[in-house]
């Protein structure tokens, strides 16, 4: 005789409130409102093959960390009354094995004997967190079933949900956008849709915060829809991305990911996706669909080999510049299984590493995958910061926030860059959870203290990690400040934490190796902080040849130098050039006085360069450091925001005709102070040196912000070229109108098809009347080249840019100069598909700039 199973109807609370009830035990409405659900059953009962008694579940009755339960990826039977997790009613005992169904889709999962152990404490944070996003205009007794958060039944069904089932609705339908509003996903010739190319970044300004004003919620939903479409594809993840980048010299720093670690990442990612969708459900109001197992996406991560390739890309484009990977972080499997790591925070950390590697990959599919992962991790990280989980280490949270901000600022997605810019100050405060300073001799004293060797090593690693994180935040903050022209969040006077130690000591694999290297490193390298190091530099105590500073120390010295230049540049925008009547003559704060201080800072930059050139180092980190030096030197002599504003305005509608003496009209018109009159040649030399270093950097080792440097140098070089050769940079429309006006004023008629602009003596360039100057190549020689020194000191020669094939481009050739920088963004010699999203955005910005000035050339891709 088959037992009877009661048919549940609306519970008591939903019935009294006259609200819709999903008729689960407990129902989603009671769980979201933290109520004790009282289910009711109909008089008639239905027959079911299996039936067990289900107890009433109170919302606070959740298992703790010590009651960890094993979640199997295979089929599960209903649990007894002592368990909290309840199986879904759609699971049938005669259904095929879930693991076999998942294998049919191409995803690899572990067998039943290899189980994924997940802590169930943080899984239930998804349930009450949605109440924070409840609209204020919804009464408590009103039906909120369409906005309800997932209950424990759904979480249990989510882990073992078969990937071959019908996934139902997409993300756009889920958040209330019809299918007709979804943009076409047909790729263009470079793998991206036309609408995506036109809406990724602000026109002519890649991601600059001062141009953001519109709402990006629709772009966020579109990105999440594409992410779900990517992870829901039935075909397996192709290895084209790994095969394309397999030939690149990625160092094998991190150990390969095992299938067990991948399965743990799948489970964590699935729950993060559920959490993100539940939050977006609350934010999109009553038009959204109810969250149910029918419209949930089953996340399918790339294979382990592809994940290994993405982690190698992460080490190339990020970690080799900051050195945050210790011996334990070099193994991604230990990150997930480390007893001191919270599972959710460890999963977010590893997923962000993978997402940064995917951002550096030129495949459009990888970019969509990285943006979706970034949004999921951002939502989860906000919850960790608000809840302040006691078991989560502050350095893990700070590490996750650093990776998230770095990924968001250089992702190329406008909505993500806008959110990250808004959260930049909030994430920076994570560093203040731990004290910023400690005794610099503490590590040396611990060697002779009462702790054993293992405790000494563990104590030193915690302090070293905090030190490296602090200074990594400083370096990334300087990169954001330099590229986006925003103030820095750090000052040198607060940097009292000891500088990082040597890489050999940091990468020690065992406590024995660390103990053998520690006395030597602590004895030869005096522990100091950045504030003391900068004081020694300002006092001229660091001289070339006396002592060789590590590369990381020289990189950190650029942070306060950039801060002084930026601060003085802000002052120059506030003080007028003309004298003010009410000011006293002896007042120190004036425009000339600030220029004098800026000259003093400029005198410090060559001293830093003398220290840097004594390093026998050709690593990508050294090349990146020299690029930062030249950018700071350019900021000291040029105002990039004014240059950018002048170029974005485009040429003037009406230009003043040249006078008989031969002075050419400037197509920029009258603009604010941009470049000092006596620094134009020196600025061109710095631009050429950056272009030379850009060519030396291998494509696999380029940081994510590398193309932003090309954009910055392109605008400065174009501006100086216009100032140097204003006649050649006049658009053809302006030249034609000026010729007609000149001919009509002289009483002659001109044929529109036979007008030769260069034959008019009024438009003959003044350089042509002078003796021929020898070309000075800017981007092919070292800075100590004699021709560059003569050009800087005596202004002799005509600056040129050298192309890869040996041809020279003069700055008086607008189309060739524009084409040179457009091709340089993605390498020029590489196919168009080998451009990341940020590189393609910068390239689009330069193309629009060339089109606005009338010098856009069609390129073969």
Curated annotation (Swiss-Prot):
Disruption phenotype: Impairs the production of oxopyrrolidines A and B.
Function as written in the Swiss-Prot or TrEMBL entry: Transcription factor that positively regulates the gene cluster that mediates the biosynthesis of oxopyrrolidines, polyketide-amino acid hybrid compounds with feature structures of tetramic acid.
Record localization: Nucleus
Keywords from the UniProt entry: DNA-binding, Metal-binding, Nucleus, Transcription, Transcription regulation, Zinc
Single annotated GO MF: DNA-binding transcription factor activity, RNA polymerase II-specific
Pfam families membership: Fungal_trans, Zn_clus
UniProt keyword Metal-binding, yes or no: yes
Name of the protein this chain belongs to: Transcription factor opdJ
SUPFAM superfamilies recorded: Zn2/Cys6 DNA-binding domain
Primary residence: nucleus
One Gene Ontology biological process: DNA-templated transcription
Origin superkingdom: Eukaryota
Organism: Penicillium oxalicum (strain 114-2 / CGMCC 5302)
InterPro entries associated with the record: Transcription_factor_dom_fun, Zn2-C6_fun-type_DNA-bd_sf, Zn2Cys6_DnaBD
Any single GO CC term annotated in Swiss-Prot or TrEMBL for this entry: nucleus
Residue ranges of the annotated DNA-binding region, renumbered to this chain: 11-37
């Amino acid at each position: 005789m088959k037992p009877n199973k009661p048919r549940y109807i609306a519970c008591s609370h939903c019935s009294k409130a006259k609200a819709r009830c999903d008729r689960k035990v407990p129902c989603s409405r009671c769980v979201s409102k933290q109520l004790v659900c009282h289910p009711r059953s109909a008089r008639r009962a239905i027959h079911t093959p299996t039936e067990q008694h289900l107890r009433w579940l109170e919302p606070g009755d959740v298992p703790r960390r010590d009651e960890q339960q094993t979640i199997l990826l295979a089929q599960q039977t209903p649990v007894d009354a002592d368990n909290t997790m309840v199986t879904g009613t759609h699971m049938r005992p005669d259904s095929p094995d879930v693991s076999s169904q998942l294998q049919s889709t191409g995803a690899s999962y572990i067998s039943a004997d290899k189980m994924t152990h997940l802590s169930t404490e943080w899984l239930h944070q998804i349930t009450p967190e949605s109440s924070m996003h409840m609209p204020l205009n919804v009464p408590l007794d009103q039906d909120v079933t369409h906005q309800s958060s997932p209950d424990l039944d759904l979480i249990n069904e989510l882990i073992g949900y078969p990937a071959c089932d019908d996934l139902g609705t997409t993300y756009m339908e889920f958040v209330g956008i019809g299918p007709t509003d979804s943009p076409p996903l047909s790729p263009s010739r470079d793998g991206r849709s036309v609408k995506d190319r036109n809406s990724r970044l602000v026109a002519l300004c890649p991601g600059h915060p001062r141009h953001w004003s519109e709402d990006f919620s629709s772009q966020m939903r579109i990105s999440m829809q594409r992410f779900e479409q990517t992870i829901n594809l039935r075909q397996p993840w192709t290895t084209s991305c790994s095969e394309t980048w397999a030939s690149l010299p990625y160092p094998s720093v991190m150990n390969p990911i095992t299938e067990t670690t991948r399965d743990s990442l799948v489970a964590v990612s699935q729950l993060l996706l559920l959490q993100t969708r539940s939050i977006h459900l609350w934010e999109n109001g009553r038009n959204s669909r109810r969250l149910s197992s029918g419209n949930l996406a089953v996340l399918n991560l790339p294979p382990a080999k592809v994940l290994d390739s993405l982690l190698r890309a992460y080490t190339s484009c990020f970690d080799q510049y900051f050195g945050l990977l210790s011996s334990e972080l070099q193994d991604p499997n230990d990150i997930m299984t480390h007893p001191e790591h919270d599972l959710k925070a460890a999963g977010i950390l590893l997923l962000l590493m993978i997402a940064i590697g995917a951002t550096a990959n030129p495949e459009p599919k990888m970019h969509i995958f990285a943006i979706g992962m970034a949004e999921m991790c951002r939502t989860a990280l906000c919850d960790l910061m608000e809840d302040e989980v006691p078991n989560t280490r502050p350095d893990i949270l700070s590490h996750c926030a650093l990776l998230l901000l770095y990924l968001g600022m250089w992702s190329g997605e406008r909505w993500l860059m806008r959110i990250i810019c808004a959260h930049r100050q909030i994430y920076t405060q994570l560093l203040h959870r731990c004290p910023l300073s400690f005794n610099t001799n503490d590590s040396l004293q611990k060697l002779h203290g009462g702790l054993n060797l293992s405790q000494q090593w563990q104590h030193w690693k915690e302090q070293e990690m905090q030190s490296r994180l602090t200074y990594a935040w400083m370096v990334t903050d300087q990169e954001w400040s330099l590229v986006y022209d925003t103030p820095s969040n750090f000052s040198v006077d607060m940097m009292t934490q000891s500088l990082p130690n040597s890489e050999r000591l940091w990468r020690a694999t065992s406590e024995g190796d660390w103990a053998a290297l520690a006395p030597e490193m602590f004895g030869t390298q005096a522990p100091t902080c950045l504030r003391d190091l900068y004081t020694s530099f300002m006092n001229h105590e660091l001289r070339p040849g006396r002592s060789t500073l590590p590369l990381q120390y020289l990189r950190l010295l650029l942070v306060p130098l950039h801060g002084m230049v930026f601060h003085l540049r802000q002052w120059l925008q506030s003080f007028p050039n003309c004298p003010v009547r009410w000011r006293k003559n002896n007042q120190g704060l004036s425009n000339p006085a600030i220029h004098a201080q800026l000259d003093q800072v400029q005198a410090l930059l060559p001293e830093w360069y003398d220290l840097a050139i004594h390093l026998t180092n050709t690593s990508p980190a050294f090349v990146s450091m020299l690029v930062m030096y030249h950018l700071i030197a350019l900021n000291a002599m040029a105002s990039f925001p004014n240059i950018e504003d002048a170029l974005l305005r485009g040429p003037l509608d009406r230009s003043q005709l040249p006078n008989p003496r031969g002075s050419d009209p400037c197509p920029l018109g009258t603009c604010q102070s941009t470049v000092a009159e006596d620094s134009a040649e020196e600025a061109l030399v710095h631009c050429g040196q950056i272009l030379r270093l850009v060519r030396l950097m291998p494509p696999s080792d380029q940081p994510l912000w590398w193309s932003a440097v090309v954009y910055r140098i392109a605008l400065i070089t174009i501006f100086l070229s216009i100032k140097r050769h204003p006649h050649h940079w006049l658009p053809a429309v302006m030249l034609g109108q000026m010729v007609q006006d000149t001919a009509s004023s002289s009483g002659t008629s001109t044929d529109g098809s036979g007008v030769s602009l260069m034959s008019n003596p009024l438009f003959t360039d003044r350089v042509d009347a002078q003796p021929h100057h020898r070309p000075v190549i800017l981007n092919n020689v070292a800075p100590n080249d004699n021709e560059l020194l003569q050009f800087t000191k005596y202004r002799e020669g005509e600056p040129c840019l050298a192309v890869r094939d040996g041809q020279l481009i003069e700055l008086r050739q607008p189309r060739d100069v524009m084409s040179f920088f457009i091709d340089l963004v993605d390498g020029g010699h590489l196919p168009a598909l080998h451009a990341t999203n940020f590189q393609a955005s910068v390239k689009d910005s330069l193309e629009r700039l060339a089109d606005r000035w009338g010098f856009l050339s069609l390129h073969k891709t």
